[in-house]
């Protein structure tokens, strides 16, 4: 009996163990073990980390090299500029100090020998530093040279040049003609010039098409002078060029299109209210005679539209 019971227990346990064995045999990729997949993943991750580190290392080295070159260039420029200052200081005469009368001949001999050594040493150093100085001047470019030339000029000549350049002619004024596309043109005129003269001078053949506007005012009278219109130096006059077909002969013809357009606008606006009243009347007629086609929400909406339109009409015409 005991042996049969054990056999039955073994038979009942066998399906569970077989299912466990089947689950343990399942792999991510058929034909490749899970251990191989884990090792491959670790290798790929390691390679990715190494490549990322190498890329960042290369970028850092290039940046450091670039910074090093910039710093070295800055140091050389500072050294060259310091040498230039030394040369300038050497070029300026210094006040000579008279030797003390109590000094002996030995001191004078030592001073002369030291000064001779310095003078012999200076040409060599100056000759060594001349190429670097020329290289510095080539790097700095033309503005540095121009600045040096301008600084070497006497102050009197600079004052004369400035006075001659900045002194404008009292009989001429500069007028800025600004167009609609934000382009400007500089016009030179006299305060006694008229608007017609300005148009014919800068817009020949287009006098009738050009409209000049100054401080929001249209300059229509061609006989008015610039001084009478308070147009001074560096004033801005807005210019508008109308198309050739839109050239107007006089003020009477310019007023007729505006009046016609305003009358048309009034007619269209006055027709909108009667048309809407007729539409509302037709809808209410169908609502009264064919009420089976109108639901409760449609009737409520119609009542609301009618009330709103009534308030609107009373507000417009009840003023």
UniProtKB/Swiss-Prot annotation:
UniProt-annotated location(s): Membrane
Bilayer disposition of the protein: Multi-pass membrane protein
GO biological process, one term: ERAD pathway
Location of region: Disordered: 88-130, 146-165
InterPro entries linked to this entry: TMUB1/2, Ubiquitin-like_dom, Ubiquitin-like_domsf
Record Pfam families: ubiquitin
Cysteine-cysteine disulfides: none
Main location: membrane
GO cellular component, one term: membrane
Membrane spanning stretches: 36-56, 264-284, 293-313
Name assigned to this protein: Transmembrane and ubiquitin-like domain-containing protein 2
Domain (Ubiquitin-like): residue spans on this chain: 173-246
The organism of origin for this protein: Rattus norvegicus (Rat)
